[in-house]
Amino acid sequence: MKTGRIVKSISGVYQVDVNGERFNTKPRGLFRKKKFSPVVGDIVEFDVQNINEGYIHQVYERKNELKRPPVSNIDTLVIVMSAVEPNFSTQLLDRFLVIAHSYQLNARILVTKKDKTPIEKQFEINELLKIYENIGYETEFIGNDDDRKKIVEAWSAGLIVLSGQSGVGKSTFLNHYRPELNLETNDISKSLNRGKHTTRHVELFERQNGYIADTPGFSALDFDHIDKDEIKDYFLELNRYGETCKFRNCNHIKEPNCNVKHQLEIGNIAQFRYDHYLQLFNEISNRKVRY
């Protein structure tokens, strides 16, 4: 038996990496009976006849899992936003962050296309990133000339997953980091101001101290797994300041003696972050129940 990590999955064939050697495997029928499917990122135990024929016998317990796209055992989710084409959006960024925290993922922020961004817009984005840094996020704002290899190798060890909407430059970033990958890229649609999907599946690529993965771009975010009363926990500063609210289950909206509302009034919480919290709270509150 061998133990390795699934690095690629296409049409029911799972490519497993063991110390740089890759094996094509399939899951045993036991998984189908249990209605359980391995995903990229899983640590698995498998037997092999040769590099093109192996069978997965066991999937080890996942420490976390992103559902869309399915990836497990993520150490850091890098949320990739572009400064322009498509334009930087704090609302979209906050929604990505909520998704990340709902799956117990450590998140950091990467903004691309600095070289295509007017100076005034660069200043505006830098000021916004300072707000996120004060909340506790690590951020980068990069252009075409920045050394991707230096950036990636400075990130923490383990599995790094790049995630973001289509057209923000995830595949371009990886091509600069590892030119031999030659990943397909595409410009954004001029009419829709969003990118076309060029990455169609998740694949892990080796890096000095772990793996890095590109993921298919998002066209929509799914919050079906999140309850309205959980959302405040996924806005880190609201969660932190909310610990001293009068009521333990305070949602920071109309409740009396709310420390979050107090911190908002004195400027310790950014108004746009609170507004995005309210928007998402109301959106999920008004969500139709699915049967």
Swiss-Prot record:
Protein name as annotated: Small ribosomal subunit biogenesis GTPase RsgA
Keyword field contains RNA-binding: yes
GO terms of biological process kind: ribosomal small subunit biogenesis
Annotated binding of GTP, by residue: 112-115, 164-172
Keyword terms, alphabetized: Cytoplasm, GTP-binding, Hydrolase, Metal-binding, Nucleotide-binding, Ribosome biogenesis, RNA-binding, rRNA-binding, Zinc
PROSITE patterns referenced in this protein's UniProt entry, alphabetically: ENGC_GTPASE, G_CP
UniProt-listed InterPro entries: G_CP_dom, NA-bd_OB-fold, P-loop_NTPase, Ribosome_biogen_GTPase_RsgA, RsgA_GTPase_dom, RsgA_N
Gene: rsgA
Pfam families to which the protein is assigned, alphabetical: RsgA_GTPase, RsgA_N
One Gene Ontology cellular component: cytoplasm
The family this protein is said to belong to: Belongs to the TRAFAC class YlqF/YawG GTPase family. RsgA subfamily.
Entry function: One of several proteins that assist in the late maturation steps of the functional core of the 30S ribosomal subunit. Helps release RbfA from mature subunits. May play a role in the assembly of ribosomal proteins into the subunit. Circularly permuted GTPase that catalyzes slow GTP hydrolysis, GTPase activity is stimulated by the 30S ribosomal subunit.
Compartment list: Cytoplasm
Cofactor: Zn(2+)
